[in-house]
């Protein structure tokens, strides 16, 4: 491994891999080609990951590359790759090879297809390998590997992941830079998705119910969940009621495909709700999902039905609560919504959070 890092510094000082929006990054990715048995020709064109990005047909994440441009990196001894006008070339399908040239750093993100989520990979001049991080930081190396094919890359990733986790979660050898210089240290590792879907039919570890404090599921989504779950769900709810505003409790899911239903109290029986209650209820739901060992969770739009809370505001508050959450077992949150307006609201809230994280 030491030889790999030395090789990376000697032959590929410019090739740095990271996750967009401050997600896990590896500063010595350049040596991966040598470690995986690939050749190292001029530049970094032989990297398995870059080859996967260049060959769009092989890389399932290629279609989700966001439009942006490549910019020169401030790397000593390298010359930026530029177009005829002297400006940096765009990272479109024809210009993806520029990612392999010395001195070029990509500013795009490659997102997992089918999500609006926060998991992404890219190239970046940061070196947060030396920054202490939380144990959850390794979650997205697996997501990254699923976006790139090739058995050699997968074998190398496993070795790479173990080494990076040990290095990045100890204070030994840590960089003297303050943690705040590592973009995204406070960004949640949870993958976010938005779907127009019937929450009672989702095959996830847990789904949520926007409930009242008495856990009487009489109207809206709560009534639909109670009907789908069967009488056992209401019986368990009655046993655990009442609960406080912003609190969450779990019951079994009854006849639904999920394992649990997490009931979050967003209002008194028949009463209005507020932004503070929605934020607290979302945070309590996420904590409860971690307590139950859930990896996947469906959230409904809290407070926007009987509670009458504005949809855009609810989306912003709920997405913000998920991004601030430091997950234990939770890896994936699906916002299960009804209607185009709700889908647009939650998608916009997720995108706004990603844009803020990149800045």
UniProtKB/Swiss-Prot annotation:
Domain Macro, chain residue ranges per copy: 179-354
SMART domains cross-referenced by the UniProt entry: A1pp
Superkingdom assignment: Bacteria
Record InterPro entries: Macro_dom (IPR002589), Macro_dom-like (IPR043472)
Annotated region described as Disordered, given as residue ranges: 73-93
Record's compositionally biased regions (Low complexity): 73-88
Coiled coil: none
SUPFAM superfamilies: Macro domain-like
GO cellular component, one term: extracellular region
Pfam families per record: Macro
Listed name of the protein: Uncharacterized protein Rv1899c
Organism the protein comes from: Mycobacterium tuberculosis (strain ATCC 25618 / H37Rv)
